[in-house]
UniProtKB/Swiss-Prot annotation:
InterPro entries: ATPase_NBD (IPR043129), Gcp-like_dom (IPR000905), KAE1/TsaD (IPR017861), TsaD (IPR022450). Fe cation binds at residues 114, 118, 301. Its EC number is 2.3.1.234. The gene is tsaD. It comes from Streptococcus equi subsp. zooepidemicus (strain MGCS10565). One of its GO terms (cellular component) is cytoplasm. Keywords: Acyltransferase, Cytoplasm, Iron, Metal-binding, Transferase, tRNA processing. PANTHER family: TRNA N6-ADENOSINE THREONYLCARBAMOYLTRANSFERASE, TRNA N6-ADENOSINE THREONYLCARBAMOYLTRANSFERASE, MITOCHONDRIAL. HAMAP family: TsaD (MF_01445). Its cofactor is Fe(2+). This is tRNA N6-adenosine threonylcarbamoyltransferase. It catalyses: L-threonylcarbamoyladenylate + adenosine(37) in tRNA = N(6)-L-threonylcarbamoyladenosine(37) in tRNA + AMP + H(+).
Amino acid sequence: MTDRYILAVESSCDETSVAVLKNDNVLLTNIIASQVESHKRFGGVVPEVASRHHVEVITTCFDDALKEAQLEASDLTAVAVTYGPGLVGALLVGLAAAKAFAWANDLPLIPVNHMAGHLMAAREQGELEYPLMALLVSGGHTELVYVTEPGEYHIVGETRDDAVGEAYDKVGRVMGLPYPAGREIDQLAHQGTDTYHFPRAMMKEDHLEFSFSGLQSAFINLHHNAQQKGEELVLEDLCASFQAAVLDILLAKTKKALKQYPSKMLVVAGGVAANQGLRERLAKEITDLAVVIPPLRLCGDNAGMIALAAAVEYDKGHVADLDLNAKPSLAFESFHQQ
């Protein structure tokens, strides 16, 4: 049997990444050029800055990925690329590079949904069992996705306002923590207690929707009022109280989803899946089925996860023409409607 090699490109936000996947789930290389330091002084991602950085480094990422994988372009089977959702300018840089490379080397182009990439990063751990439920938690998305078979995604619940990762960054900014704030809030939370008892929105409703705007407002109001009165708040307890509320919401909705949709396993993926508090709660509270979480190196944005999702799409015969365009608001339901 001839080995299959898929080169994948990811540029949907502030990470420029190129990876090479061998056969079904063996990552030979996963080059990531991070822009975190460039955006830190702005307190968040600046789209124009992100696009310019992608342009500056993407060619080098291609070269490094092939060199590290010890392959030539002629060894490749296909090229995969994220075409949405994400920042339109950032997406277009990766798309242009991937399409040019595919055209120059006469390779098929595989379109990949960025969030499907996060979900399918779990494939590196081994074969997934279907149907499965997935909790996708990142800076831009909070979704419960029911996957009936490989490549068939159905959103059964999502946030009505901010994504959970965005909520972490917003309250982190209020506390004066550096961007991105998720990791530091998680670390501080482990040193504090749930003292402030923030609200947990829509916990008792039967639906699977999320909301974090009320939690953010309660946090900001508490912090502002304390400053006005000259009261000192304990940073560790603030973080612990915020994280406890977030995790209560995520766990409650996930448990409801598992009751409503027969599932053989739970996949938890996305940047926030790196949160140690979330991992601890999942291990403690969901014990009646397998919980699969990608390794930390595959939780943030990276092309390795895009390659793992692309392998599924390639097996299903999903390829795109070279007129494939960026879809910054791409949803799972429109995934194969290029």
